[in-house]
Amino acid sequence: MFLLHFPSALIILVPSHRIAFTMSTDHSARSPRLRACVRCQQRKVRCDHKSPCGNCVASDSQCVPATLTPRRRRFQERVLLDRLRHYEGLLRQHNIYFEPLHPQAKQEPVIADVPRDCERSETARAQTPVQSQAVDLWQAISRVTLEPEDDDGDSPDVQADGVENAWDHHVDQPEANDQTGDDLLFGQPQANVNVLALHPEQAQIFRLWQTYLENVNPLLKVTHTPTLQPRIVDAVSDLGDIHPTLEALMFSIYCIAVMSLADNECHRLLKSSKEDLLARYRLGCRQVLIKCRPWQFTNVDGLTAVYLYLVSVSPQTDPRSLSSMLAAALRIAQRMGLHNESTYTRYTAVEAEMRRRLWWSLVIFDHRMCEMSDYKVTTLTPTWDCRIPLNKPTEALFAVVRSELADLIRHTTFHINFVNPVLAAVAKAKDPGHVSISADGEMLTIQRAIEEKYLAFCDPADPLHFMTIWTTRGYLARNRLLEHYARHLSSPAMQQTDAQRNAALSYALEMLECDTRLRVSPLTCRYRWLVDFHVPALAYIHVLNDLRKRPTESHAGKAWQAMSENYEARAMHPKPSGQGVFTVFARVVLQAWGAREIFLRQRGMPVEAPQIVLDIRSKVGQTSSGSSMVPSCSTGEPSHSSIAISAHSEAIPAQMNFTGHSADGQAFPGPDLGPSSFPDVAGPPGMDIDIDQFWTAMDWRLMHTQAW
């Protein structure tokens, strides 16, 4: 029985079989809708709905009954929203400002079911979305603590700026002047120093500025000449009324410009010695930096001044100390957001580009300092996303190429293994052409990409292009050598073949050859200050170690020639310093040549000492009067017995402690070839790159400061 409800609220009981019969009768009584045939629909005439219809019979055409067209499906809202989210993601990825569809909506974290032992499977971990953008603290606080109607819509940047302004207001108070921490690294300002008197004369200011534009700016590209030069011209007209940040930048330009000159050039251009000029301008730079609170910088000019100042003092500074100072500068840069690409949307194109150049210059300089002190603490890691500078205009070629090469290196497996293997999980292999890089040939792929994208279009007759070509190739060879070490140190059971040893030696020799080209070419005379900063110490270590172990190989003659040529090229511009490190270097060279000389004499072959050996014997003979190490006047070489004595003479001690640094201590990168160079990579006993205690005791960072 069914209850039927009528508007009159009368309830009638009707049998169920009566209801079913009535429904079936009504359904069958409906006649199907008749549609015109296809021909009549096309001609738009009335069809009699027969088969065939009269119109088709009259026109003698085939009558095709029409069928119901499929109903057009409604566009799914989910598909539309997914497509919209995809487009919004692309806009965010390219840092393009837009108004999102749901600005207040936040994706709730997905909580996956986990077992009781709190372990997650690799599949679940891979499916968990990873958030690339860090959560902003001020935005989170405002979301949680404010009601929606109380939120004034201020962005996190505005809120963070409010906090910075509060700190600035605090340190401006007289009672807070002793709590700012400005004296932590640069010390207290000297009251008896007249900074205005430390400025050079107007003519010399423009001469130093021109020197900076010719010697330094083409390589670093951290200042924008069209906008900075008018500011300097205006400042020179009234040195007593300069903004402290601009004044610090000017002093840092003085410092690095003088550092790029030779001593005779300083006398000719500035009428004073290089040492006196550096002491004067560095003092002025420090005083002005203290005045403008360097560790609280929020503008690029101040950070650029710190960077240029640190570069200018690097030749006379312990790399460990300089690395610590750079760590503070990098923290300032991170606070300013230079490492985060998403922060660049609030700046103009020129400002954003200059910030990128400054960040990459800081990172590359820091990496060089870490090579000479502690490789593992480098900032060249895949944990930040600042893009490389653009090669527009092409005058920034050197800075762009070294930035892109550093960007590729920081994602390679061998580099991450040396720095921190944990970062391999977040690293991604990439190259300029977005082609996948195999782990077995990372550096080979990178080298081909750099050669095809940049070096193939360089003009060797152009000084900047010449510098770019050979600096890049030398750096590529160095990293191929490091890749060789990482590959064999990570495989204890795998012994090196002769082909692999020869390949590694070829990388070291290429480093020497590239450095020699940069040293002897007149095209690089303006850039020699940077060439001095990158001594191929790793190449010397590898070549000398290989020659000691394999003195009978056919490549030995080429190796000795390459070392001699590089030695002579660097001796063209010697640096006065002590004899400690040179003495240790001399011992190693004489040991390697002693093994080679024994082989030649046993084979009855003529023994002709290379120039590097002759020069070292001469210098060691001058320091040890009456020693048998003095070369013979007739032949220019000592007897076989005298070589053995000289290699183990008391004049060349077997153990020397070189923990300190000379007055010019930038020099060689720290690592030798032993496992102690890379503590995170265990050196297997069977590895054929072992170094004895003598090699471990030597501090190779100081070697280039000697007069050799």
Curated annotation (Swiss-Prot):
GO terms for biological process: DNA-templated transcription. Residues 37-63 bind DNA. SUPFAM superfamilies: Zn2/Cys6 DNA-binding domain. Its main location: nucleus. One of its GO terms (cellular component) is nucleus. It holds the Pfam family Zn_clus. One of its GO terms (molecular function) is DNA-binding transcription factor activity, RNA polymerase II-specific. It is found in: Nucleus. InterPro entries: Sec_Metabolite_Reg, Transcription_factor_dom_fun, Zn2-C6_fun-type_DNA-bd_sf, Zn2Cys6_DnaBD. PANTHER family: UNCHARACTERIZED TRANSCRIPTIONAL REGULATORY PROTEIN, ZN(II)2CYS6 TRANSCRIPTION FACTOR (EUROFUNG). Transcriptional regulator; part of the gene cluster that mediates the biosynthesis of the tetrahydroxanthone dimer neosartorin, which exhibits antibacterial activity. This is Transcriptional regulator nsrM. It comes from Aspergillus novofumigatus (strain IBT 16806).
